[in-house]
Amino acid sequence: MSGTILENLSGRKLSILVATLLLCQVLCFLLGGLYAPLPAGHVTVLGSLCREDHARQNDTGFLLYSRGAGACIPVTREEVEQDSTKMANELVHVFQMPLPRDLRDLDYSRWQQNLIGVLQVEFGYDSSSELREPPRELQLTIDMRLAYRNKGDPDNGWKLYAHGVEHRYLDCVTSHVGPTETLYSCDMIPLFELGALHHSFYLLNLRFPLDTPSQMNLQFGHMHDLTLTAIHQNGGFTQIWLLLKTMLFPFVVGIMIWFWRRVHLLQRSPALLEYMLIYLGAALTFLNLPLEYLSLVYEMPYMLLLSDIRQGIFYAMLLTFWLVFAGEHMLIQDAPNKSTIRSRYWKHLSAVVVGCISLFVFDICERGVQLRNPFYSIWTTPLGAKVAMTFIVLAGVSAAIYFLFLCYMIWKVFRNIGDKRTSLPSMSQARRLHYEGLIYRFKFLMLATLVCAALTVAGFIMGQMAEGQWDWNDNVAIQPTSAFLTGVYGMWNIYIFALLILYAPSHKQWPAMHHSDETTQSNENIVASAASEEIEFSHLPSDSNPSEISSLTSFTRKVAFD
């Protein structure tokens, strides 16, 4: 009997392996909790008002900036109010990022990876206006110009990055009612998203053109304060994240090579579960590959999209593996044919495939278009926001249903094995102890799978929420978000690493032993003694016994066929 390492490894060696992996898991949590800052940080910029020359309004290369030599002269709110036309089509709202601190200019680092801008609008109406209810879904037309410069460039060396005229829809509430005007504060609206933070400084010019024939922006009174919140990935978190990837990548590659070599040494073709393990390891290797180092040298605006695709491939493979893993251990197939994805699991996996394709299409519609136009967002229109929210809700519901279905499958596995344990008392003591040990080991592994699945779902949700956590208290000593994300990422690697070891074929060839004192045998000797009784299971109607990868599989199938 050969079987897997999970079955043949001694209790002492297995305890050492499990303890080592648990220690690595704790270190992954501590690495994120004690050394990594929050995944995302932010800077809030209050827009400066500048007046534009009429002759330069259509010149997209003309940029106004508020700091440095040649900066525009700021316009005060009182000057705007005193102007008879409120300086219509002359005002430019200027945002220069990042803000200086302690009289020292700061700059963005390429370690910060990406930049997202959201805008909060405040505008007012004269009290004589007929408007009484807060406006809903008002269409706002914005002329946006995004520029950049690097260290060493002159203060006026801004280069245009992107230009677009976009529409945004505002939902507002009354914030102040005065004798002369009523102020309205609106919900934040997405403004831009950069998949690469390659330059040191960024500049944003916003114009709100007025046009009577097309009724452009005429429904607004006059703009008051505009506040831009620029959200970026924290450089310290990126360094910890890449350090974790760099350390884990060679270990996973090495264990995959070792696993596949042991499989090919056997005189049989690989089983379905062995194929699934190597595919899962390949997906994890693709995710672990620290491609982000390239973004420190080259501008890669597609890095966000590529990261989403890599994580999507891993999620799809992990969800598929869990279904096959539980299904292969339910051991209820009646036919002797070899298990295949198409023959046994196409119904189970169809929902996973549809969900992954839907999320991929959604991601392409969002970040794929942003490669060409960083001001685009599917959330900008009421219909687009509803569609996007529907996708997210469906993804959450699907994840919950998947987890419940996985729990159901694992429960059936436990019940199936429990039913088969009724045959244990009829066996010899050596064989009974052997299979009882296998059952306990297998149950522990399945419970670990459930914990991994639950934390994966929670990690996915927290990953989506990470960008919204930038208003947390900066004085927190241990950041639970960073600890959780690094812990879950380490858990994926440790879990798959353990599976590749434990489900690798064992090459031990135990001789038949004849002895009377079985109670003094070690775990490995019990396995050897059980090997001498393997004739009980030699007539199973499977596709030749050498294709079995687990003696637990043989045990449950034998009792099922009996």
From Swiss-Prot:
InterPro entries named in the record: WLS-like_TM (IPR047843), WLS_GOLD (IPR053936), Wntless (IPR009551)
Residues listed as glycosylation sites in the UniProt record: 58
Parts of the chain that traverse the membrane: 14-34, 240-260, 271-291, 312-332, 345-365, 391-411, 442-462, 483-503
Ranges of the Lumenal topological domain: 35-239, 292-311, 366-390, 463-482
GO BP: imaginal disc-derived wing margin morphogenesis; intracellular protein transport; positive regulation of protein secretion; positive regulation of Wnt signaling pathway; regulation of intracellular protein transport; segment polarity determination; Wnt protein secretion; Wnt signaling pathway
Subcellular location as annotated: Presynaptic cell membrane; Postsynaptic cell membrane; Cell membrane; Endoplasmic reticulum membrane
Membrane protein topology class: Multi-pass membrane protein
Pfam families found in the cross-reference section: WLS-like_TM (PF06664), WLS_GOLD (PF21883)
Alphabetical UniProt keywords: Cell membrane, Cell projection, Developmental protein, Endoplasmic reticulum, Endosome, Glycoprotein, Golgi apparatus, Membrane, Postsynaptic cell membrane, Segmentation polarity protein, Synapse, Transmembrane, Transmembrane helix, Wnt signaling pathway
Molecular functions per Gene Ontology: Wnt-protein binding
Name of the protein in question: Protein wntless
